[in-house]
Structures are given as C-alpha cells and as structure tokens.
Amino acid sequence: MNPEQFQMALAEKGIELSDDQMKQFHDYFEMLVEWNEKMNLTAITDEKEVYLKHFYDSISAAFYVDFTKFDTICDVGAGAGFPSLPIKICFPHLKVSIVDSLKKRMTFLDALAEKLGLTDVHFYHDRAETFGQNKAHREKYDLVTARAVARMSVLSELCMPLVKKGGSFLVMKAAQAEQELQTAEKAIKLFGGKVEEHFSFSLPVEESERNIYVITKTKETPNKYPRKPGTPNKLPIE
C-alpha cells in the first residue's frame, strides 16, 4: 500500500486526509526508518509495509469506533507510537498520553511529535502497572488502547484501571482473538469491564485477520489492581 493508495483507502472509509496530514505520515515514515537504524523500533521498514501494517492498521479502529466523541486517549506500550499517533494525525483534537517502559522509545516519540508538530501529546516513561496506580491518571481517560502481543487478560489488568467509568478500552488483536477473549472474561469483569462490541475484518492487500474489541467500563477497578510490576504477566487472572 503506497501513500496514494493509503489516502484513497482511508477516503473510502470516510477519513479524508489533507496534504498537511499526508506530509505528517511521510515524515513519520522517514523518521521511523532513520531512527530504526540506531534503535530497535520495528521490524517493518519497507514503505508500503509501514503504510499498511503500521499506519492503516492503527487507524482501522476508526472504521468502527467514532473517535470524534472522545477527548482523552491513553496508549499503553505504544512502542513507536502505534496505534495512537496515526489516530492523532487523523483526529487532531484528541489529547493523547503514551506510556512505555523503554526510555529510548520516549526519546524517539518526543522527537517525532516535535517534527510532526503534534500538540496535546504527552509521553510517560513508566511501567503500566505503576502508571495504573498513579492517581493523576487512574480512571481519567475516555479511551485506552493497546495494540500489543500480551494476552487479553494481562492487557485488561494493565489498561482497565486507566479507563474512566463509562469510558472504553479498545483492544486490537490479530487471529485467535476469540479464544483469548474467553480466557480473559473473568479478568475483564473483575476490573469493571463489559465486552460491548467485536469487529472482525481483513487487512487489505495481504488479507490477514484483525479483531477489535470495545470493552466498556461499567464500574471502578478494585484498588489493588494493577498488581506489582511483572505480576500480571507471571500470574494472569484467568
């Protein structure tokens, strides 16, 4: 998917990108490849692959979820900024917070936000477990996203504490997601969530399966969650 195909594919979904926004994606791609030579940000560096598997894939959530109704977003373990920064480029009104435990990624994201001229974007170098216990952020976000490889039960413990009551947790997964969801149902309920919607689709060109789950926060997360750093991964609630 080249930049022109990317722009057309989004337009077909009702997301029209201006020349300035296309320039932001171009600069994002160039910086990603340049910085990737000195730090491991992504295994995907081919332009067409980046536009499809990073940019388009990140924005695909907006085909099913109306981002205009959200104000604050927190992206847990965003790595090189996915999915929140491509979404931010498309929906500039969003106030985005990104949490990642690797300091060098923060350096990249800071430089990237400055280069792209992104405002209302904040980066926090922290473990998700610690961040979720921080009163300044706990239950403060309209939407929390995770496009991560961790199991859904683990992601729920890391992300649900950050979602405000009535807000949403958006999980982006590849294949075998239904099985993961069944295992995570106990955890989702414990942390105050209810699975509201599930969307399944194929990524264009390569036709790989994608799943998006929208989990609504119906009640507050018990204070003891998230547990200490490392514990959710070692002893997932399932």
Curated annotation (Swiss-Prot):
GO cellular component, one term: cytosol
Keyword entries, A-Z: Cytoplasm, Methyltransferase, rRNA processing, S-adenosyl-L-methionine, Transferase
Enzyme class: transferase
Pfam families, alphabetized: GidB
Region (Disordered): 219-238
UniProt cross-references to HAMAP family, sorted A to Z: 16SrRNA_methyltr_G (MF_00074)
Protein name in UniProt: Ribosomal RNA small subunit methyltransferase G
